Amino acid sequence: VFPDKAAVVDQNRTVTFRQLKAEALHIASYIAGHFSRCHAPICFYLDKSAYCISVIMGIAYSGNFYTPIDTKMPAARIEKILETLENPLMITDKKHLPQVQKFMGDSDVLCLEDALDEPYNEQVIMDIKDRMIDTDVLYVLFTSGSTGNPKGVIIGHRSVIDYIEWVTETFHFNENTVLGNQAPFYFDNSILDIYTMLKTGATMYIIPQIYFAFPIKLLEYMETNLINTIFWV
């Protein structure tokens, strides 16, 4: 509906809805063409940026479900998550590839830069879409784990659809909404930001983490960028 409107803004680039979808379809085509996975876990290990949203959408378009991995997460926790997910595919970029290879071993690792260069395979993606149903898993987020072991919470497409329908109707979010994202993508508060943006055509600003240490600078950033909606803890 708003192809040339800003969808996601981070400190390095502004991505329109058209660009976001195009990047996601390239990523989905790469996953489908090189790994032949469906209804399978795919993790991503990336710095927080607009590329994370492209990856999230690309994984969903490929018929799989995603788990964000924080680049600051201890190796022991990452290993437990990977063990729980039972050999997931991992998406990372060239910057983080050496780190990822240390804990992934011989498991499948997809480089984001390669995926973005992959031609969009419309037929393959449409075939995947035709086989998907609303109860398919969309993501698995891991809690801190009170026992020391991270526990995965499984959420399906229908749950997110119903939640975002309720959120947008209750709070009257629309294309004029400007979201200020604070929550990490591995935390469920980010679901409101991401999927409100995708449903309504709102713009989501990924606020640089440094601003949260300086309240006045944070308020100036929000005022400059006309941010009118926040969901923070």
Task: List the predicted regions and their residue ranges.
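Carrier-protein-dependent adenylate-forming modules in NRPS/ANL systems
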Residues: 1-161, 171-172, 201
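Short hydrophobic "strand-cap" motifs at the C-terminus of beta-strands
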Residues: 11, 140, 182-183, 207, ...
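Conserved AMP-binding
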Residues: 46-49, 70, 183-190, 210
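Short, surface-exposed, polar/charged, turn-prone segments marking secondary-structure boundaries
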Residues: 71, 88, 117-119, 207-209, ...
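A conserved hydrophobic position in a structured secondary element of the catalytic/binding core
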Residues: 92, 111, 155, 182, ...
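Conserved AMP-binding/adenylation subdomain of ANL enzymes
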Residues: 151-180, 188-229
